[in-house]
Amino acid sequence: MVNNNYKYTILKTVIDRGMQLMQNDVSEDMFQIWLKYSQSVIEQIANGTTFHIGYLQVILSTMASTILPYQKLSMCLKYLIGILPLIK
């Protein structure tokens, strides 16, 4: 079992990388790479939990929309930032 401090640190790293990406002109390809990375991490630290299911819902809503990659990334980051304090 992975301890909560490790989960918190890993999730914070995902968020930080997403925030760094937002400082650039985010392309769809860049967003997709970050999304796969973030999804993989969430699966490892929260597989089958409410956090994981909630993130999958956010991902589905971004895929079903025609918003810009920057906005998609923002939606994902908003969710991850929201659950970060709950992980610790």
For the regions a protein language model found, what residue spans apply to each?
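Charged interaction/catalytic cores of defense and host-pathogen modules
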Residues: 1-88
